[in-house]
Curated annotation (Swiss-Prot):
Modification Phosphoserine occurs at: S20, S23, S25, S196, S566, S614, S626, S643
Start and end residues of each stretch annotated as Disordered: 15-41, 53-77, 332-397, 449-468, 489-533, 547-570, 583-602
Species this protein is from: Mus musculus (Mouse)
Protein name per its UniProtKB record: Carbohydrate-responsive element-binding protein
InterPro entries: bHLH_dom, HLH_DNA-bd_sf, Max-like/E-box_TFs
Matching SMART domains: HLH
Length: 864
C-alpha cells in the first residue's frame, strides 16, 4: 500500500502555484502550498519573541469571497491597494479598545470583520507595543498598557466593549474547550481525505530520524484553517458529514485533557487562563510562577514524615539456615521467642547447660542497597592499645565474634579467680552459637560502673584465629537505638585507632560468606577521623531511620575473663570507654546456676547464657533485646560480669505521636489561616460598595484590596468633612447663644404691670384679626408669625393708663424692640419657626392649605 501511494505521488504532476494578482499580501511571493518546503523554495523568516504565527495567513481567499456581496466576477480580480502603514488596522484597534490595554495576549476582535492576516498583524503590533513599554522602557506610539493597580488610570480600560472583547464574561465550559480542540485535531484528516478525493495526494513525507522542520509542520497544520472553519462553495454538500467526531477522532489518542488536569490546589486558575494550551494562545504566561502552599506543605511533610523504603535489601553475606525469616509481628507485639536448642546441642553432652536461651533477631536494614563494609566504624575503641594484650594467632577455624581483652572501667576491682573450671562444649554447637553471637554486636560495649563478679556458667573451647591481624566483628545489622549515642555529630575516633574494614569474599563450595570484619589499627596513632565523614551509610541510617525501629538496649549478663599475668592492666587501661556510654548504674541480673565442671585447655572461649527479658505489659512497642557475650579467656580464670547501661529508648512512639500532632496542628492552623483570609475577603466584598454592587463579578484579591483602600480613603475624607461641618455648627451655636445673652441683658429689669385679663383679651383680639385676614389672603398668616413677637412685647410693655405713659412706653418699646439690631434675631426666630412648622422649604405649594388649617383649628402661634 505504501509503495502504491508513493508511486501515485510520483506520477501525479502538481503544477507550481503562482500568487494570484488579487493577493494583497505584504510579503514577497509567499506560496501557501504545503509542498513549498519540500521543494526548498521556502525562505526562513525571523521570528521575534511574541510573534503570533500562522503558516499561510494570506491564503484566505475563501474568506474574501464570502465577505464580498454578489457573484464573483472577473472585475473582482483586479489589483487592490495595499496599506503599508497599518492605518486601517489601528483604527480597528482603537474602535475595539478605546482605552488602554491590560495584557498582550491574543485578541480575536469579536464584532469586527477582520481577516486572519489582519488579526495576526494587530496582535503582533500589540505585543510589540507591550515589549517596547515594559522591556525597552519606551513609550509606544501604537497603544499603551496599564496594570489594575494604577489608581484612576485603571478605570480607563474598564469600558464595556473592552471587557467583553477581552473575554472576562465568556461562559467557558470544558465542552467548549474540547470542541475547539477537536476542531484543531480534525483539520489534517479532513484535508487528507479531500486531497485523496481530488486525486492529489498531499500526505506529508515521513522524515526519518525525527520530526519534520517546524516550518513544514506549521504549514501542514494551518494551511487550510479558514476554509475548513467557514466552509465555502468549493466544499462538497456531504463534506460536513466527514466532521463526525466518532469518525475522525476514533484513532486519535486524546491525551490533552488527561495531561493538563489541574492538580488539587487551593490556588485555582482564573477564568482568563482557561484557554491555556489552545492553538491561538501560544504566548508564554506566568502560570508556572504562581506558588502553591500545598506543594510546600507536601515538601515539608516529606522531610518530617519520611520513611525509608521497606524493600528487602541484599546483604553482604548469605544467611545460614539457622537464621530463618522472622515475621514482623515479632517487633510489633514486643515478644521475642526464644530459640529452641538444636538436636546436636540437646543430645551432645551429659550434664552441660546448652546455650538455648539465645534470642535471634533479624533486624531490618534502613539503608537502601547493600552496606558497604569500608565506611563502617571500627570497634577498636574497645580494644586496648597495648599490643601485648592482643590474642596471638593460632591455626584452625575462627568464630565470628571472638572478643578481645575487655577494657578498663571506672571502679573495677581485680577479681578473684573463678572457683569453677572451664567446660568444653561439643564441636557441633560452636558454629551456630558463634553465628548467633555475631548477629548481636553490642556485647563489646563498655559496662557501667556497677559491676558484679559472677562465676562463668558456660565455657567453650576457643577457636584460634587463622592468622595475625584482624579481629572479626560483625556490624551488619545494627539497631538504630544504639547509633545515636555512639555516632553522634561530635564523636571522634580516639587517636591511635583507625577504622579499617576488610570486605568479605564468598567462600567456595556453597558455604556462606563471612560478614565484613573490622581489623585492629596498625597505622600511625595520630590519625583521627570523624564517624560522620567515614560513615555515609550510618549517617543515612541516622537521618532516615524509622522511629519505630529504635529498640531498647539489652540488659545482658556476661562473663569476661582476664589474663592473670597482667593484673596492673585492670586499673590502668583506657577509661575513655565512658565517652561512648554514660555511666548509668544498671541492676545486676540474678546469677545463673553454675554447671558441672569439665576440664579444658588453658585458653578457652567463654560464652555465657544470655537472659531474655520480657517487655512490660504497659507498652507493646517497647522491646528489650538480649544478646550474647563472647570473650576470650586467657590462661587464667578471672570472671567478671559486666552489664551495659540500661537506657530505655522508648521515644519511638512518643516522637511519632509528637510528629503527627505537630503535623495535624500545622494543617489545622493553615486551614484556619486560609479560612480567616477568605472570610476577610468576603467581608470586604460585603462592606465595599463598589464590590457589593456586583456580587457575581469575580475580582482578584489585589483589586479587592485596592478597592478597599480607595473606599477607606473615601470614608476618611467624608468623616473629616462631617467633623469639620459639625465644628462649624458648634461655632455658630455658640455665637447665637452669645447674641441671645446679649439681647436678654438689654431687657428692662421690671416689665409694665398690667392685668392678666387685659393681656388675654388683647391676644384674642389679635387672633381674630389674623383669622379674618388669612381667609382672604394666606400670606397674612405668614406675616402674623413674623409680627407676633412684636405684638407680645408691645402688649407686655406699653401702658395705656394715660397718654403720657402711652407715649413714653411706646417710645421705649420702639427703641428696645423695633430697632434693627433687635428686629434681626426676632425675625430670624420667627422664620425658623415657620420653616420647622410648615413645608415651605420642601413643598411650598402646601403652605396655603397649612395656613388655612392653622387659623381654623386654632393652632395660631404653635407649630403644626
Amino acid at each position: 500500500m505504501a509503495r502504491a501511494l508513493a508511486d501515485l505521488s510520483v506520477n501525479l504532476q502538481v503544477p507550481r502555484v503562482v500568487p494570484s494578482p488579487d493577493s494583497d499580501s505584504d510579503t514577497d511571493l509567499e506560496d501557501p502550498s504545503p509542498r513549498r518546503s519540500a521543494g526548498g523554495l521556502h525562505r526562513s523568516q525571523v521570528i521575534h519573541s511574541g510573534h503570533f504565527m500562522v503558516s499561510s495567513p494570506h491564503s484566505d481567499s475563501l474568506t474574501r469571497r464570502r465577505d464580498q456581496e454578489g457573484p464573483v466576477g472577473l472585475a473582482d480580480f483586479g489589483p487592490r491597494s495595499i496599506d503599508p502603514t497599518l492605518t486601517h488596522l489601528f483604527e480597528c484597534l482603537s474602535l475595539a479598545y478605546s482605552g488602554k490595554l491590560v495584557s498582550p495576549k491574543w485578541k480575536n476582535f469579536k464584532g469586527l470583520k477582520l481577516l486572519c492576516r489582519d488579526k495576526i498583524r494587530l496582535n503582533n503590533a500589540i505585543w510589540r507595543a507591550w515589549y517596547i513599554q515594559y522591556v525597552q522602557r519606551r513609550k509606544s506610539p501604537v497603544c499603551g498598557f496599564v496594570t489594575p493597580l494604577q489608581g484612576s488610570e485603571a478605570d480607563e480600560h474598564r469600558k464595556p466593549e473592552a471587557v467583553i472583547l477581552e473575554g472576562n464574561y465568556w461562559k467557558r465550559r470544558i465542552e467548549v474547550v474540547m470542541r475547539e480542540y477537536h476542531k484543531w485535531r480534525i483539520y489534517y484528516k479532513k484535508r487528507l481525505r479531500k486531497s485523496s478525493r481530488e486525486g492529489d495526494f498531499l500526505a506529508p513525507k515521513q522524515v526519518e530520524g525525527g520530526w519534520p522542520p517546524p516550518e513544514r509542520w506549521c504549514e501542514q497544520l494551518f494551511s487550510s484553517v479558514v476554509p475548513v472553519l467557514l466552509g465555502g462553495s468549493e466544499e462538497e454538500p456531504g463534506g460536513r458529514q466527514l466532521l463526525d467526531l466518532d469518525c475522525f477522532l476514533s484513532d486519535i489518542s486524546d491525551t490533552l485533557f488527561t495531561m493538563t488536569q489541574p492538580s488539587p490546589s487551593s490556588l485555582q486558575l482564573p477564568p482568563e487562563d482557561a484557554y491555556v494550551g489552545n492553538a491561538d494562545m501560544i504566548q508564554p504566561d506566568l502560570t508556572p510562577l504562581q506558588p502553591s502552599l500545598d506543594d510546600f506543605m507536601e515538601i515539608s511533610d516529606f522531610f518530617t514524615n519520611y520513611r525509608p523504603p521497606q524493600t528487602p535489601t541484599s546483604s553482604n553475606y548469605i544467611e545460614s539456615p539457622s537464621f530463618g525469616p522472622m515475621a514482623d509481628s515479632l517487633f510489633s507485639s514486643g515478644i521475642l521467642a526464644p530459640e529452641m536448642p538444636s538436636p546436636a546441642s540437646s543430645s551432645s553432652s551429659s550434664g552441660m547447660t546448652p546455650h538455648s536461651g539465645n534470642t535471634r533477631l533479624q533486624a531490618r536494614n534502613s539503608c537502601s542497597g547493600p552496606l558497604d563494609p569500608n565506611p563502617f566504624l571500627s570497634s577498636e575503641f574497645l580494644l586496648p592499645e597495648d599490643p601485648k594484650t592482643k590474642i596471638p594467632p593460632a591455626p584452625g577455624p575462627t568464630p565470628l565474634l571472638p572478643f578481645p581483652t575487655p577494657v578498663k572501667v571506672h571502679g573495677l576491682e581485680p577479681c578473684t579467680p573463678s572457683p569453677f573450671p572451664t567446660m568444653a562444649p561439643p564441636p557441633s554447637l560452636l558454629p551456630e552459637e558463634s553465628l548467633l553471637s555475631a548477629r548481636f554486636p553490642f556485647t563489646s560495649a563498655p559496662p557501667a560502673p556497677g559491676v558484679s563478679t559472677l562465676p562463668a556458667p558456660t565455657t567453650f573451647v576457643p577457636t584460634p584465629q587463622p592468622g595475625p591481624g584482624p579481629v572479626p566483628f560483625s556490624v551488619d545489622h545494627l539497631p538504630h537505638g544504639y547509633l545515636e549515642p555512639v555516632f553522634g555529630p561530635h564523636f571522634t575516633v580516639p587517636q591511635g585507632m583507625q577504622p579499617r574494614c576488610k570486605p568479605s569474599s564468598p567462600s567456595p563450595g556453597g558455604q556462606k560468606a563471612s560478614p565484613p570484619t573490622l581489623a585492629s589499627a596498625t597505622a600511625s596513632p595520630t590519625a583521627t577521623a570523624t564517624a560522620r565523614d567515614n560513615n555515609p551509610c550510618l549517617t543515612q541510617l541516622l537521618r532516615a531511620a524509622k522511629p519505630e525501629q529504635a529498640l531498647e538496649p539489652p540488659t545482658m549478663p556476661g562473663t569476661l575473663l582476664r589474663p592473670p599475668e597482667s593484673p596492673q592492666d585492670t586499673v590502668s587501661e583506657i577509661p575513655r570507654a565512658r565517652a561512648f556510654f554514660p555511666p548509668i548504674p544498671a541492676p545486676t541480673p540474678p546469677r545463673p546456676p553454675p554447671g558441672p565442671a569439665t576440664l579444658a585447655p588453658p585458653r578457652s572461649l567463654v560464652v555465657p547464657k544470655a537472659e531474655r527479658l520480657s517487655p512490660p505489659a504497659s507498652s507493646g512497642s517497647e522491646r528489650r533485646l538480649s544478646g550474647d557475650l563472647n570473650s576470650i579467656q586467657p590462661s587464667g580464670a578471672l570472671s567478671v560480669h559486666l552489664s551495659p547501661p540500661q537506657t530505655v529508648l522508648s521515644r519511638g512512639r512518643v516522637d511519632n505521636n509528637k510528629m503527627e500532632n505537630r503535623r495535624i496542628t500545622h494543617i489545622s492552623a493553615e486551614q484556619k489561616r486560609r479560612f480567616n483570609i477568605k472570610l476577610g475577603f468576603d467581608t470586604l466584598h460585603g462592606l465595599v460598595s463598589t464590590l457589593s454592587a456586583q456580587p457575581s463579578l469575580k475580582v482578584s484579591k489585589a483589586t479587592t484590596l485596592q478597592k478597599t483602600a480607595e473606599y477607606i480613603l473615601m470614608l476618611q475624607q467624608e468623616r473629616a468633612a462631617m467633623q469639620e461641618e459639625a465644628q462649624q455648627l458648634r461655632d455658630e451655636i455658640e455665637e447665637l447663644n452669645a447674641a441671645i445673652n446679649l439681647c436678654q441683658q438689654q431687657l428692662p429689669a421690671t416689665g409694665v404691670p398690667i392685668t392678666h385679663q387685659r393681656f388675654d383679651q388683647m391676644r384674642d383680639m389679635f387672633d381674630d384679626y389674623v383669622r379674618t385676614r388669612t381667609l382672604h389672603n394666606w400670606k397674612f398668616w405668614v406675616f402674623s408669625i413674623l409680627i407676633r413677637p412684636l405684638f407680645e412685647s408691645f402688649n407686655g410693655m406699653v401702658s395705656t393708663a394715660s397718654l403720657h405713659s402711652l407715649r413714653q412706653t411706646s417710645l421705649a418699646w420702639l427703641e428696645q424692640y423695633c430697632s434693627l439690631p433687635a428686629l434681626r434675631p426676632t425675625v430670624l426666630n420667627s422664620l425658623r419657626q415657620l420653616s420647622t412648622s410648615t413645608s415651605i422649604l420642601t413643598d411650598p405649594s402646601l403652605v396655603p392649605e397649612q395656613a388655612t388649617r392653622a387659623v381654623t383649628e386654632g393652632t395660631l402661634g404653635r407649630p403644626l
